[in-house]
């Protein structure tokens, strides 16, 4: 599994859109790894670094959706980029990978996490996503380092999977 991030970076060198890069990774996996399935999300933030406007372009292959927290207290999962896991057998359905775009408002926070943060044995995925949303919203106005420390601590123990959390906060106007 550790090979896939490096392979993904090397396939993205030409700034091709996220869906095409993830498709290339899916095509390459059987030939260059022993990983049968994986769930990446590949996202690209576009816009002027300090002034915006910003747009997120992404695709997901079975990964939990990004969570957007706006400065005015709104929150929602960005589900338009959801697609099939890497390694899903051909003909399973789904067609081409989604190429999702979403404008990101100034001052908003974007959270991406692995399923280890939301999946707990005996609890379904929707419950885990709702729990993450609730705790993230309560921490939305905290500094990012506090949010990243406190959010996993507020999730129930018992996950048997890896936990990773990436948080991005855009400058306020």
Task: Pin down the residues of each PLM region.
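Conserved subregion of the PPM/PP2C metallophosphatase catalytic domain
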Residues: 2-173
